[in-house]
Structure formats: C-alpha cells, structure tokens
Amino acid sequence: MWVFVVENKTFGNRAFCRQVEGRQQFGDYSQEALQDLIRWRDIWAPALRAALRQIGGLSLKPIIARALQMGDELHNRSNAASSLFANAMAVPMMEAGVPKEALISTLDYLAGHELFFLGLSMASAKATADPARGIKYSTVVTAMARNGTEFGIQVSSLEDEWFAAPAPPVKGLFLPGYSEKDAGLDMGDSAITETVGWGGFVLGGAPGILSLVGGTPEEALSYSREMRQITVTTSPEFRIPALGFEGTAVGIDVRKVVQTNILPVIDTALAHKNPGHPIIGAGLVRPPLECFKKALSRFTEKYGLN
C-alpha cells in the first residue's frame, strides 16, 4: 500500500502515513470500504506521486501554518489544509502527464475528502516530535498513543519507555444510529498531533469543529489558553488568530501536568467497540493522570532526584 513520506529536513529524520479514510481504518471491511483502498493503490496514489516527483516534493509547514489561520486544528478538522494540498497538486499532476481519467478521479477524490490531510499532519507531527527524543533531563512528552485498552505516553529523557494507564472513554457526539453504548474506549495514533500542539490545543482557532465534537466557542478558547499552563513554550511559526495571533502551546511538560492536575485535551474520532463499523462519532478526551505520574516517578528515579 502506498504511503506518504514526510521528511524533517533540519534533522534528517522521516515519518510516513497511509491514506486516511473513515471506514476500513475503523474496522469496516465491507467491499465498499475496501474499494477506496483499491482506488488509492491503483489510481490516486500513483497520480499524486507523479505530481510530487514533478515538483521535487512539497513543503508542508506553510500549508500547516496557513490552515491553522483558516480554521483548521489539523486533527479532526483539516478542511483548509486538504484544500491547500489539492490546489498544490492540481497543476503538477497535469504537468506530469497523469492520464485524464486518473486526473479527474484524483481531483474529485481530493475535493470531496475534507479529512485527507490528517495523515500528513500526523506524519508531520511525528517527524517534528522525534528529534526531541533522548534529551537528558527533559520532561517534554514526545508521543501519546492509545489502542482502545491503554493510553500511553513517552518522554524525551526516558526515550523509548512507555508509561500507560487504562484508556478512557470519549465524551462526544454520535452519528445517526449510534450511541454511547456502541463506543469503544479511546484509541488511535492521531494524538501525535496534540503532542506537537495541534488538535485540541488549537480548538480556540477552529470553532467549526465544535459541530463534530461538541462544546461552545468559549470552551474552545478556554482549552487553548489552559494548554499554555502545561507546556514549555509557544510556537513562533504556528499562530491562532482568535487569540491575538499568539503561538500555539507546544511541549507538554509532565512536571507541569502533575503539578497543576491539568491534562492535555485531545479531540478524537469515536470507533465502535465491535468490528464491522465505520467511524461512529467524535468528541473530546483527556489522558489518564496516572501516565504522567508514572513518567515523573521514573524521571526522578533515573536522575536521583528523590
């Protein structure tokens, strides 16, 4: 299966992502769901590869910065980023000589897929976070992930150790035909976006997502302000217009999380507890505090700070 490769040119590391869709990756293996994977393999991915080779690659940082100022939070709302990516691919696909039918099919796919950029934002976040690993004495979180059973975090100075606790339920809104009783516990790798200060951290600049995850614009702004209390800095490159163009909060510090009892806020999709279903809704969730307490305890043990 084709993947995108995202390279951090400053540090030379890479991350990758698959096609994002709302059916098979949530456990729906119907023929209809699999058809999108087949079209990705045979039509859409080859067309996009031709375009990217035509222009020698595409810089994602400008797209991300613009999208954040256009109402995206780059986790469950990537409408602007997906459109900007589609615009960037249109002419190069034509210049690369992509056959007309494949060109039209790929453009139609991009135009109708508002969540397309999520895979690229996840890979960008991963490529951004990985160079922060292995820094002595650092208590900055470098990964957050969930598997429907456990929620785990990794911390810079503790390198590849995982600190896990039971995965929490997600509070949110459900698509027609589904309810709380159908939902599994929090799961997925997409919280890597919050790890670098996107997603729930920038809800204040993405009020459009509230119709999907629930909440009010005032609450969204309060989440973005609250995240500043548990992070080490703000981004000089990614800014939120609704907060006076302040930079996004970045660098979750396990010490601050434990000291304040403020947990990172994550907006996330809801998966069914049983296989055979597409996405069933979306909402907000916070990691278990126990993850951060375990990490801080290990940190003090490692560096003899008891």
Predicted regions and their residues:
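Anaerobic metallocofactor- and corrinoid-dependent redox/one-carbon enzyme cores
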Residues: 1-306
